[in-house]
Amino acid sequence: GTSGKLFSQSLDEAVWAIDAARAFLVASVEMTLQERLQIEKGFLRPCADLLLSSRDKGNWQVWHNGGIIALGVALKNDSIINAALNKPDLGYYDMQKKNVYNDGWWNEGSVVYHFYPLRAILLSAEAVRCRHINLYDEKVINMFLSPVNMLYSDLMFPSQNDGWYGTTLLEQAGLYEIVALRTGNQKIIDVL
């Protein structure tokens, strides 16, 4: 048997699982049934089980949930997706409630630590679209708008808390493009 574990920490498992699940969905149309089942049973499901048992209270859990969601979509398993969204204290919705202020700022207090979980949130929102779940709510839109209010004229952000200088909005343009496409929010479009 296999454990679905490839890395030394659950954060790396989750980040990698998101890309692996997406790649599986693309490649699976060219696979035989036996090949698909081997990957599902030998990696995808064990990795989902591993991430479902991982617990964190901050940005790691957001990535865990993103990995679980991506794996649930790849496995076409709504109960896995539901756990990632609704698990008490750990699910997507509780993480948003606990960690995102009303103005859209992530509670770790730096731009760097704001965009890190925001990328996982965006990947989660994209993954569940195929299950007719819309995570592009006001809180997510505010997460994209709030950093814009503190930009320097050169599109750089100030260094805050344990973040670092040199972080720029240009690095995040791809995320903003997706949110603009999905929401049609004029303020997001204006940022671009």
What is the predicted function of each stretch?
Residues 1-151:
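Aromatic-lined, polymer-binding surfaces characteristic
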